[in-house]
């Protein structure tokens, strides 16, 4: 079954700035933030909205500089107003699926090989990236690493001053571990994963509509 979701880029600007809380020496901001961003130093994480969190007490926060992550944390006191830097307690983090955006006909990419079902539960744009909360099926403890890719399908010009529509497809390859693999159906589980793909070069300077397409299976597996 084919699904699509439309996103207006003007809304994405609002999403990316929702948690841009001002930082002052006396402020304490007791809330949980869940954001995409990058590792910007030892134990430092900067969100797409410009917040920087210091996870000095998090032993498990051991990622290379520049790694893109999805992080949930409890935000604490302001450390440096000039840098919008806060102390924070890490709740959890994950490395999202990512990769360069491809186009139909790209050398080495055969879209027909990426035909397994994937579902999009949420999507937003921040930091020049399309961020997606996805689900697919796989067999428990199989060890198989499934693959997802993001395909730019083209642009439709708006009529009568309407914004242009940019179409993207999220496609998936279960590597033989998915719903229709013929494996033990009783051992199938739902796998939830974040994905993030750089879309800045495709976005116009003005407003646009993003049309996102993906394929999921019906209850009978088709």
Kindly give the residue locations of the regions a language model identified.
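First exposed extracellular module after export/assembly in secreted or surface-exposed proteins
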Residues: 2, 32-222
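Bacterial N-terminal signal peptides that target proteins for export
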Residues: 2-10
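C-terminal motif of bacterial Sec signal peptides marking the signal peptidase cleavage site
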Residues: 19-22
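Bacterial signal peptide processing site
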Residues: 24-27
């Amino acid at each position: 079954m084919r699904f699509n979701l439309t996103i207006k880029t003007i809304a994405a600007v609002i999403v990316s700035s929702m948690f841009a809380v001002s930082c002052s020496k006396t402020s304490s901001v007791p809330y949980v933030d869940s954001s995409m961003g990058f590792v910007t130093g030892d134990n430092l994480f900067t969100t797409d909205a410009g917040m920087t969190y210091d996870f000095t007490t998090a032993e498990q926060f051991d990622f290379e500089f520049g790694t893109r992550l999805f992080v949930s944390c409890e935000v604490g006191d302001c450390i440096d107003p000039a840098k919008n830097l806060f102390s924070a307690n890490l709740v959890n983090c994950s490395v999202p699926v990512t990769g360069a955006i491809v186009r139909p006909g790209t050398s080495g990419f055969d879209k027909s090989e990426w035909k397994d079902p994937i579902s999009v539960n949420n999507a937003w744009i921040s930091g020049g990236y399309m961020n997606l909360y996805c689900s697919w099926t796989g067999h428990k403890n199989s060890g198989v690493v499934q693959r997802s890719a993001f395909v730019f399908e083209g642009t439709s010009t708006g009529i009568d001053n309407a914004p242009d529509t940019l179409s993207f497809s999220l496609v998936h390859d279960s590597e033989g571990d998915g719903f229709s693999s013929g494996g033990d159906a009783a051992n199938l589980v739902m796998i939830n994963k974040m994905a993030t793909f750089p879309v800045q070069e495709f976005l116009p300077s003005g407003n646009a509509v993003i049309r996102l397409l993906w394929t999921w299976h019906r209850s009978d597996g088709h």
